[in-house]
From Swiss-Prot:
Belongs to the Cap17 family. Coiled coil: none annotated. Its EC number is 3.5.99.-. GO terms for cellular component: cytosol. This is ATP nucleosidase Cap17. Has 2 domains, an N-terminal domain probably involved in sensing cyclic nucleotides and C-terminal purine nucleoside phosphorylase (PNP) domain; the PNP domain has ATP nucleosidase activity. Expression of the C-terminal domain alone stops bacterial growth without cell lysis in E.coli. It comes from Escherichia coli (strain KTE188). Residues 1-229 are annotated as: Cyclic oligonucleotide sensing-domain. The keyword Ribonucleoprotein does not apply. InterPro entries: Cap17-like_N, Nucleoside_phosphorylase_d, Nucleoside_phosphorylase_sf. It catalyses: ATP + H2O = D-ribose 5-triphosphate + adenine; dATP + H2O = 2-deoxyribose 5-triphosphate + adenine. Pfam families: Cap17-like_N, PNP_UDP_1.
Length: 505
């Protein structure tokens, strides 16, 4: 559930004095519906209060007083929690407001439904008013208006706050720019500048959210608007402090991670400051959700893995890192589709070059942090593990083949701990795979990224685990047949471990 206690919406805009009554009435009715939907969602509103500009027929040309009067009518339905942030000035209170309107503000203050912020009378400019509103708001909805709306939107974009413009043709009180209509057109061109996390998804809905030619009733349209803002806030909250970084190297591994972690195949990635693609996910647990970031190295190799892991650690500062994917296994020890979790990683490339062209192995060995080792031991000892993994495999649609020409196949999803030999070689020689056991007699899995990930995490004090599905035996039978199966199996174990194995500090 999205925490909305500190979220505030600015409904920015105005109406031209020449706008038809039909559209003026629709705009104010929509703002009243929005006010209710926003308050229902435990979200607040930001307003600027001064006079009440009207056209020759007495129709109000701004929305702030509409919001306040609706809030006064509704406030008995809510627990007072300063849901309104009112920006005004002493001179505006004194010279531009009626006594009746001043009493409305007092009523909201006494009920603890509003906080009032007073601008210095000598500093009242459109820019300063806008800055004060934007400082208080975490989202903006735009209707009509001109340069003032555009200026507020520019400030909101710099703060990475969502902006939802509507297409109702209202003009603006100053007739000095395109306002919400310009923002609406901009949304189609650059959706992520308007909703930084969910912009592409919102863009796909924008045509159905027309206020000029409404498909939905105004109440439902206001509810959808708030739902979109809440989805964006939720996505941004996930990014602030993700619990776990989930890493892959190859496209087949990334596809498996997205499938198991519930990321739609057509969901557009976000970009880090270094241009690395990533997706947000959440794993539900009894002690609260685990927030995660899924990313990929986009190629194999420990050097690349170390560099990208370091960049992602610096950007997201996760509590834990899991790398998942495929690996080669020793035929005598492993079966196809089996999943292993690293208990240690050996970097087999390190050596001394001796006289006569001889090499003396000097392997680097990295082991699990003690808390991680304890978590893994407890996880593997759980009696319900096998049944739970079977249920997960069935739910995701993973079926192990009965047999394979390449060798023995796992009867189902099985997992154990193992020692990984990591280097820069794509293994197609079983004798070489066997020789890794001379470095450590428990080394029975070979791959190309684990040491890079472990080393990067070790340097920053972040615990890491490697989860690998066995896709081949590192010999002449090696092909791509088990890549997808082994990747999905590894992803299932990764998700299950995060839900049931990792004990948060």
């Amino acid at each position: 559930m999205t925490n909305t206690n500190n979220e505030y919406v600015l409904i920015a805009g105005s109406i031209s004095k020449n706008t038809e009554k039909l559209y003026i009435d629709r705009a104010h009715s929509f703002v009243r519906a929005l006010t209710k939907s926003i308050l229902d969602a435990n979200v607040g509103l930001v307003v600027y209060l001064a006079g009440e500009p009207v056209n020759e027929n007495g129709a109000l040309l701004t929305f702030d007083w509409t919001i306040v009067k609706e809030a006064v009518d509704l406030m008995e339905n809510y627990t007072p929690a300063h849901q309104l942030k009112i920006v005004t000035s002493r001179s505006a209170m004194r010279e531009k407001m009626s006594e009746e309107n001043r009493m409305l503000i007092r009523k909201l203050q006494v009920a603890r439904f509003a906080d009032v912020s007073y601008l210095d009378d000598d500093l009242i400019t459109g820019g300063n008013i806008g800055s004060e509103q934007v400082d208080a708001a975490t989202a903006m909805i735009a209707l009509g208006g001109g340069k003032g709306v555009s200026d507020r939107a520019s400030k909101m974009r710099k703060a990475n706050h969502p902006i939802l413009p509507f297409d109702l043709e209202l003009g603006g009180i100053c007739d000095d720019g395109k306002g919400a209509l310009g923002l609406h057109a901009h949304f189609y061109a650059e959706p992520l500048s308007m909703f930084p996390c969910t912009g592409e998804a919102v863009k796909n809905q924008l045509d159905t959210l027309s206020l000029q030619e409404p498909y939905y009733g105004l109440e439902r349209l206001s509810e959808i608007a708030v739902e979109l803002l809440k989805a964006e806030w939720a996505a941004q909250q996930l990014l602030h402090t993700p619990s776990v970084l989930i890493l892959t190297a190859l496209p087949v591994e990334l596809a498996a991670a997205k499938k198991v972690f519930g990321i739609a195949d057509d969901e557009s990635p976000r970009l880090t400051s270094n241009g690395i693609h990533f997706w947000s996910t959440s794993i539900q647990r009894s002690d609260g959700p685990v927030t995660g970031i899924v990313a990929s190295f986009a190629s194999a190799g420990n050097v690349n893995a170390s560099a990208i892991t370091t960049m992602l650690l610096s950007e997201f500062k996760p509590q834990k890192v899991l790398m998942m994917g495929i690996a080669a296994g020793l035929r005598e020890k492993m079966v196809l589709g089996e999943v292993i979790i690293s208990e240690r990683v050996i970097y087999y490339e390190s050596a001394a070059a001796l006289e006569g062209g001889k090499f003396a192995p000097r392997p680097e060995i990295l082991c699990l942090h003690m808390p991680t080792k304890q978590n893994l031991n407890t996880y593997l000892a759980t009696t319900s593990l096998s049944a739970r993994l079977g249920e997960r495999a069935q739910a995701i649609g993973l079926e192990m083949p009965v047999n394979s020409q390449a060798g023995d196949v796992a009867a189902g999803i099985i997992v154990s701990s193992a020692t990984i030999a990591s280097g820069e070689l794509l293994i197609r020689d079983p004798a070489l795979l066997e020789r890794f056991r001379s470095l450590h007699d428990k080394a029975c899995v070979a791959e190309m990224e684990a040491y890079g990930v472990f080393d990067a995490c070790e340097k920053q004090g972040v615990p890491a685990l490697i989860v690998r599905g066995i896709s081949d035996f590192g010999d002449s039978t090696k092909d791509d047949a088990f890549h997808s199966i082994a990747s999905v199996a590894a992803a299932i174990i990764t998700a299950d471990y995060l839900q049931h194995g990792w004990i948060r500090a």
